[in-house]
Amino acid sequence: ETVSTDFDTGDRLYFEPLTNEDVMNVIKAENPIGVVVAFGGQTAIKLTKFLDKKGIKILGTSAESIDIAEDRERFDELLEKYGIFRPKGESVMTLDEALTAAERLEYPVLLRPSYVIGGQNMTIAYTDDDVKQYMAIILAQGIENPVLVDKYMMGTELEVDCISDGEDVLIPGIMEHIERAGVHSGDSIAVYPAWNLSDRMTQIIIESSKNLAIELRTKGLVNIQYLIYKDELYVIEVNPRSSRTIPYISKVTGVPMVDLATRAMLGEKLKDMGYGTGLYRKSPYIAVKVPVFSFEKLINVDNHLGPEMKSTGEVLGVAGTLEEALYKGLIGAGYKMKKKGGVFITVRNSDKAEIGEIAKKYYDLGFRIYATEGTADVLKKYGIDAVSVKKIHESKTNNTLTLIESGKIQYVISTSAKGRIPSRDSVKIRRKTVERNIPCLTSLDTANALADCLKSHYSQHSTELIDINHMREEKLMLKFTKMQGIGNDYIYCSTFDQEIS
């Protein structure tokens, strides 16, 4: 979410922190006609109020519009105007207010600060104790903006990146997350185009995105995260800025989003840019974005995925089917995709109603299933001959940790969310998978997708390299130009005639 630091990309390159004082020093040195905050992530967005008060011109979406998107009460008024739903929620400043709000909304609830960065300090609370623990941490840091308490709804999460010129909106594509709401969008596996979306819901998303972008008077990029729960569309949040999915959606759709957004910020109209308005046509392939993690370098960090972002990168899998694209993405992210061996399963009580069908897929593929006692009892009801494994404190020589160390396990499914304390069994198990380089799936949706992928029998020998440009209806002109100072000849490629000239 930052500008490239290549010396030959920008006219100027400053290595300075994004603080009020340092940014003002750069502005004084450069004396620009205006500044763009939309490409600096949430950190840059937080500078908008300060810059506006200093009389600095904000190019693109105004400081006022950004504040409406971030201010709960003002944003709720906007949603009410267009009949757009959002999960019920309240803004609080104290522990008592947070407990009262959680009781009113009913558990589970999602707790997060305003102007949140990367899901930082974001958590799902299931009890009063969870709220007390969270608020103690937040209040100790000192808060300037309210803490948001939202009703947590486990539905299908979707993401839309739009370009707006203030009058029209272009939506290059709609992405669907494999993991249900509750896992940070940066840690979710995202699929383009969305594969479970009805025509009716697609139209609602298009209309809602257009209304929100225009009513907020956005000029440039806007990222909107949606939730489908019981066949109703809810807005999770609207970010009037560039998101981490911009490079992904630009690449797979062929829409140069940064270029078009910058032109819109400077006053050009979308209808004059050649890409139309509304929802851009679907690409003839499936593209899957898979997150990459670096848990092996982080000591005592739980690899359970939740509202707080933990990934450090991402890879892209492209193919004609979802299963093949997912297989490519998982291989690229470091999964070995082993097709025999053992699967160890331990899930929280709320997941036991769903784990049976998922475990059956692994069982039918020939995997040996191991599980903790409670989970094993559930699996046996589905005809799965699961081997019951003792917990860490129940046996020193034959427990969950020794099983993982034995080399019998190829995949671990562990969904217990109680992961803030390193001494807990669930955290120890997940950390052991990191040490042994065993894929650990902390969401049932990820485990289900992996099982379907293994069931499809794709391998590195049966997949093929895809040139997405060849599959598009309109080919893109690719130019390889000479780089300064290295003395190499350049190659000019025109994909219209598929010949190098």
Task: Give the residues covered by each predicted segment.
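Class I SAM-dependent methyltransferase SAM-binding "motif I" and its flanking Rossmann-like core
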Residues: A451-E473
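ATP-dependent carboxylate activation and anion-phosphoryl transfer catalytic cores
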Residues: E1-P32, T43-I45, K57-G60, Y82, ...
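Short hydrophobic alpha-helical segments that form membrane-spanning helices or hydrophobic packing faces
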Residues: G119, L450-D452, Y492-T495
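A glycine-rich beta-to-alpha transition motif near the start of alpha/beta enzyme domains, typified by
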Residues: L476-S501
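Short beta-strand segments
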Residues: A38, E237-N239, K289, T346, ...
